[in-house]
Amino acid sequence: MATKTLSILFAASEVEGLIKSGGLADVAKALPKSLKDLGHEIHIAMPAYSAIPERDDAEVLLSSTLEHWPHTPYQVRSLSVEGITVLGIECADYFDRAEMYAENNQAYADNGERFAFFSAACLDMLPKLKIKPDVIHANDWHTGLLPYLLKKRYANDAYFSQVRSVLSVHNAVFKGIFHYDDIGCLSEFKTHYVPEAAVSHTHISMLKAGVQCADKINAVSPTYAKELLTELGSHGMASDFQAREPDLFGILNGCDYSEWSPETDTFIPKQFKANRISMVRGKKVCKAALQEEVGLPQKEVAMYGMVCRLTNQKGIHYLLPILEQFLKHDLQIVIVGTGDPVLAAQLTEIAAIHSDKFAFVEAYSNKLAHWIEASSDFFLMPSEFEPCGLNQIYSMSYGALPIVRAVGGLKDSVIDYDSDNENATGFSFINPEPTELLLVLMRSLLLYAQDLNEVKRIQLHAMKQNFSWSDAAEKYVEMYLD
């Protein structure tokens, strides 16, 4: 293990504990915390959105303007999460909005300008605050311009001469594609010719800029790193990732067990441990409470849970065609999520027809997310693609066996029962077809009906898996120093 103490700036568009829309926020809290626990000095940089409750009471560390953006002042607020200083970049023009990225399913038209400003301000504030990181760790397209600006604008700046950049790719489907004019406030883009970022004569990709310019690139699972080298897996960026293959790493995300452990979970009706008596009793109480909460009959049947964004990426289009056929059997399903209104309407209609077996909650509730993990016997993640995934790891911790499509981090973290009975932690299928999903669902249900003891054994084995962030953090440090 590396002994050198590093100073790290972790830049992300959202951080759990302050504001969250997806899994990136979980990583942006848990990984910095684990890096700090390893003895490294870390700051987090994020936009100080007006929706962050603590923002307006936080200390102002800096009030400044950008040299190339003189009419848009910004402030840096001192926020905190898990004892780590969060440098919140406040700018009313860009971050005082009702939401982070979009309203009414419509992305803000100036998102390119907003996050170009954020990246520029991140670098501008560092010498002014006398923070000199060894590593700047960017995440996804929102901060993809950080490595680019570091390499271009600050190439001859002595303050940044020893700074290395890393870009984590959490989901390459979101490339941050914008017209040159949308980010023309950055002087580097006024020429309308930036080969490192260009995707056409008129548009650039912030993600591509980061991939081209970062010193190291990290995919959030080993399998996803391999998938990024293909046209399908990279969503059209294969040549960019192939050109950087020697600098491309794949590190599986960890689980924040301080939040996702049935032994200490304050959300669930009854806590339980990874032994048979405790698990059976705890999950029984939790299942009954969930059934009452969502209006399902109090029955001891196989419970299937799902918590996700309602998008095709999450495999809803594999589930919908076979859902009613599967509901003919003795079981219950609870799905919680928001997203595509068409998918939500279809789920609502099926739930109305099968109200004794299927409940759909069109909302995101952290409490319900925890309840579903604790109550379910099986957890559905039939994703079309899944760079890492976290819910399958949470599920194992609670003894809810994940049913996954073997892609990305799902392939790296779930051992299929039919492939390895002894070490199994769930069930998986490969072909992206509704019929394939139905087959694996029936495999799980048949095992539940015929050998409940075996299901309990697998659940206990799954609960004993360890996907700690401390292990992942050590791999990140090795990458930083590589």
UniProtKB/Swiss-Prot annotation:
GO cellular component terms, A-Z: cytosol
InterPro entries: Glyco_trans_1, GS/SS, Starch_synth_cat_dom
Residue positions binding ADP-alpha-D-glucose: 20
One GO molecular-function entry: alpha-1,4-glucan glucosyltransferase (UDP-glucose donor) activity
This protein's record includes keyword Chloroplast: no
Keywords: Glycogen biosynthesis, Glycosyltransferase, Transferase
Keyword Transferase: yes
Source taxon at top rank: Bacteria
Gene3D superfamilies for this protein: Glycogen Phosphorylase B
Pathway recorded for this protein: Glycan biosynthesis; glycogen biosynthesis
Catalysed reactions, as listed in the record: [(1->4)-alpha-D-glucosyl](n) + ADP-alpha-D-glucose = [(1->4)-alpha-D-glucosyl](n+1) + ADP + H(+)
Enzyme Commission code: 2.4.1.21
An example Gene Ontology biological process: glycogen biosynthetic process
Function (record text): Synthesizes alpha-1,4-glucan chains using ADP-glucose.
Family per record: Belongs to the glycosyltransferase 1 family. Bacterial/plant glycogen synthase subfamily.
Cross-referenced PANTHER family: ALPHA AMYLASE DOMAIN-CONTAINING PROTEIN, GRANULE-BOUND STARCH SYNTHASE 1, CHLOROPLASTIC/AMYLOPLASTIC
Protein's UniProt name: Glycogen synthase
Gene coding for it: glgA
